[in-house]
């Protein structure tokens, strides 16, 4: 009788543990880099970029988001846009 009760309790605990949902996963990462230089007596930004990544499973599916921004005082607008597109494709 005692073995039967222990077996029933163990079975209930196993069913309860395996029926729980998986834990929520959330990972975030960010980095920023900047370089400045004095040119013609003025401080100019050679490059300034930041990248943010996050991964979570809030909806039950693993979702990865990526945001990047880039700026420069010495590059043309076309070059800046090209670098921004490359950063957002990574």
UniProtKB/Swiss-Prot annotation:
InterPro entries hit by this protein: Acp26Ab
Pfam families documented for this protein: Acp26Ab
Keyword hit for Transcription regulation: no
Localization in the cell: Secreted, Extracellular space
Keyword Lipid metabolism: no
Keywords: Behavior, Secreted, Signal
Cleavable signal peptide: 1-21
GO CC aspect terms: extracellular region
Gene Ontology BP annotations: mating behavior
Physiological role: This protein is transferred from male to female during mating and may affect egglaying and behavior after mating.
Name of the protein described by the UniProt record: Accessory gland-specific peptide 26Ab
């Amino acid at each position: 009788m005692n073995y039967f009760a222990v077996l029933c309790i163990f079975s209930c605990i196993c069913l309860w543990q395996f029926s729980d949902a998986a834990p929520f996963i959330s990972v975030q990462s960010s980095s920023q880099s900047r370089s400045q230089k004095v040119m013609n007596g003025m401080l100019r930004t050679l490059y300034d970029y930041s990248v943010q990544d996050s991964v979570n499973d809030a909806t039950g599916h693993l979702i990865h988001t990526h945001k990047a921004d880039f700026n420069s005082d010495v590059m043309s607008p076309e070059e800046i846009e090209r670098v921004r597109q490359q950063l957002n494709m990574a």
